[in-house]
Amino acid sequence: MSLRVHTLPTLLGAVVRPGCRELLCLLMITVAVGPGASGVCPTACICATDIVSCTNKHLSKVPGNLFRLMKRLDLSYNRIGLLDSEWIPVSFAKLNTLILRHNNITSISTGSFSTTPNLKCLDLSSNKLKTVKNAVFQELKVLEVLLLYNNHISYLDPSAFGGLSQLQKLYLSGNFLTQFPMDLYVGRFKLAELMFLDVSYNRIPSMPMHHINLVPGKQLRGIYLHGNPFVCDCSLYSLLVFWYRRHFSSVMDFKNDYTCRLWSDSRHSRQVLLLQDSFMNCSDSIINGSFRALGFIHEAQVGERLMVHCDSKTGNANTDFIWVGPDNRLLEPDKEMENFYVFHNGSLVIESPRFEDAGVYSCIAMNKQRLLNETVDVTINVSNVTVSRSHAHEAFNTAFTTLAACVASIVLVLLYLYLTPCPCKCKTKRQKNMLHQSNAHSSILSPGPASDASADERKAGAGKRVVFLEPLKDTAAGQNGKVRLFPSEAVIAEGILKSTRGKSDSDSVNSVFSDTPFVAST
């Protein structure tokens, strides 16, 4: 008795005809994979290989039995409402496009997209989002397109798009933004690959002109601003005119949609087209100032190195740059030229600028792969820094000398008024004068001169007594009805002026300035 062992290929070869062997193997592989890996198409959805559409089915979450290897999932017009860490029950590693528009979504929590890490396109348009914050998209490292238009977004946190290093297009049209999202281009969370930003039809009244010059030209050409309620301003007008001259499609294609509000007074205003040539009446100095802020007018100093960048919209990859000087001289990379050098990224360096180097320089960028070319004109002004510094130094010296003279004059006046020195002789004379004045007052108030008073003082005292010894007029006959309060005025006067040698000056003073009241007799 012999034992024969048959393997599966042997058994298949004995039972199945050779022509059907491959078909049976394929069937066995399909059964081995099973429905757990492949998934089924739910009754609420329509499936086509790697595309699943579950639109308008009143879904509040993603069905768990979807095909896990799908690449596109459309869940629009449902009732999802809130995106949290559990709204997708399983992981979809192959999913690269997720459409969630018209779902009344009001909030997005951190970790909502942890099960879809390979998304490249996310559509959250036409929902009810009010804010975007806390880096809710940080798991989407390879996201390229994000649609957030037609929401109620009024605030964007600077860190909201942190980690989206591959994001190229961002749609924010039709929201309630009141400020241009400058943090997308500068700062810690800037998006270096962002080439398209649509913030049209928001509520932005002005642009940050002092920071817009920090945005490279290849990113500037993809900023769409039309439909915002701008306030008429020459700086904004200069910016849009400059974009129009550079043939940016964001301005060329929507020229009539750029409007601004012109206020005639505090209550009345009218809306006008911003890019009309005749209505703004902006001076050349303001326009040139805006171009200088944008980096297209440069100030150079004689002898000081200057570097000028070619801010082209074509970018640096696969782009060749050449410069044309004011004298039509061709400046190319890697060529020896006196005082000039051009880098491969388009930057022009003037080692030691001279007055004759001033003028308009044209940078020509040619991208052969994209069949694009652009010419950027840059104005360079050259001035002498030593002359300007000498004038400034002279002006400073003059001002400082004048100020020092004024301070010295004030100090001298104060010293003269409050700190005038007085010698000893001056002090002695001052004391004698004070003594004479006190004696004179005593002689006036005393009835007679003191025993030790000098002859001059007695004369002075006698002269002073004349005031009190004027003869009293007799008004008894003609008083005209006046009441005579003191019938014996002469007697009282004599009593006051009668000299008593035994009394001191203090007693005389006390007698005159007595607090005892006079009583009128009738």
From Swiss-Prot:
It holds the Pfam family LRR_8. Residues 228-284 form the LRRCT domain. Residues 501-522 are annotated as: Disordered. Disulfide bonds join C41-C47, C45-C54, C232-C260, C234-C282, C310-C363. GO terms for cellular component: nucleus; plasma membrane. LRR repeats lie at residues 69-90, 94-115, 118-139, 142-163, 166-187, 193-214. Glycans are attached at N104, N281, N288, N345, N373, N381, N384. Residues 289-379 form the Ig-like C2-type domain. It comes from the Eukaryota. InterPro entries: AMIGO, Cys-rich_flank_reg_C, Ig-like_dom, Ig-like_dom_sf, Ig-like_fold, Ig_sub, Immunoglobulin_dom, Leu-rich_rpt. Belongs to the immunoglobulin superfamily. AMIGO family. PANTHER family: AMPHOTERIN-INDUCED PROTEIN, AMPHOTERIN-INDUCED PROTEIN 2. Required for depolarization-dependent survival of cultured cerebellar granule neurons. May mediate homophilic as well as heterophilic cell-cell interaction with AMIGO1 or AMIGO3. May contribute to signal transduction through its intracellular domain. Binds itself as well as AMIGO1 and AMIGO3. This is Amphoterin-induced protein 2. The gene is AMIGO2.
